[in-house]
Amino acid sequence: MAGSSEEAPDYGRGVVIMDDWPGYDLNLFTYPQHYYGDLEYVLIPHGIIVDRIERLAKDIMKDIGYSDIMVLCVLKGGYKFCADLVEHLKNISRNSDRFVSMKVDFIRLKSYRNDQSMGEMQIIGGDDLSTLAGKNVLIVEDVVGTGRTMKALLSNIEKYKPNMIKVASLLVKRTSRSDGFRPDYAGFEIPNLFVVGYALDYNEYFRDLNHICVINEHGKEKYRV
C-alpha cells in the first residue's frame, strides 16, 4: 500500500532454512518402507509444506488482485505443488465477492540427469503458448536453483506478450552458481542440497514421498541411471 510505513514482505525468499539446520530424524515420521536406508533426514515435514502453500495462495491472490489467472505448471516435479496451490487459490475465490477464473496448462523442462544440472534446458510440451497472449500468467515451479532454467522459460513466454508473468516456486536453493533470479513467491529457501519428496524426484523415484527429504549417497547410487 502506497504511503504505508510497514516493510513489504519478501515473498521471493520464503521461509529460510539455514545451512546448519540438522533436519528432523526420519524415525519421527512415517514414509514409504521401500525408501528405508536411502534418506539422510526430513528437511520439511508434509504438514509444514501444506500450511506454507496455503499462505502463498493468500499472498498471490492479494497481489494479483483477484484477476483471472492462467497457471502454467512445470512438470513433473511441480505438479503436486501446483495442484495444492490451485486448490487453495480456488478456495479463496469461492469465499470472495468475485469469481476468479483459473485455467491450468502444463510444460516440462528437462535439466537434470542424476543429481547434476545439465548445461542446456529441454522444453517439452506447451506447443500452443500463443494462448498466453494478454493473460495474467502464474508459472508454478518446484525448485529454483541457478535461475538459468527459469530465465530461459520466461524469455520464451515473453514472446507471446502476456499481460503479466509471476513465478511461484516451492523451493529456492542458495547456491554460489545462482545468477540472482528470485521468484515472485517462494515457499522455502533451502541450502544447496539435492532434495526429494512431495513429487520431487531422483530419476523418477521418491515422488510418492510426502515429506521433503535429503537423499543420502546410498540412495543416489541405488537409483542412478
From Swiss-Prot:
Gene Ontology CC, one term: cytosol
Keyword Acetylation attributed: yes
GO MF entries: magnesium ion binding; nucleotide binding; protein homodimerization activity
Record carries keyword Metal-binding: yes
Gene Ontology biological-process entries: purine ribonucleoside salvage
Superkingdom to which the source organism belongs: Eukaryota
Keywords: Acetylation, Magnesium, Metal-binding, Nucleotide-binding
Binding locations of Mg(2+): 141-142, 201
Family per similarity comment: Belongs to the purine/pyrimidine phosphoribosyltransferase family.
NCBIfam families per the UniProt record, alphabetical: HGPRTase
Oligomer and partners: Homodimer.
The protein's name in its UniProt record: Phosphoribosyltransferase domain-containing protein 1
Organism phylogeny: Eukaryota, Metazoa, Chordata, Craniata, Vertebrata
Gene name for this UniProt entry: PRTFDC1
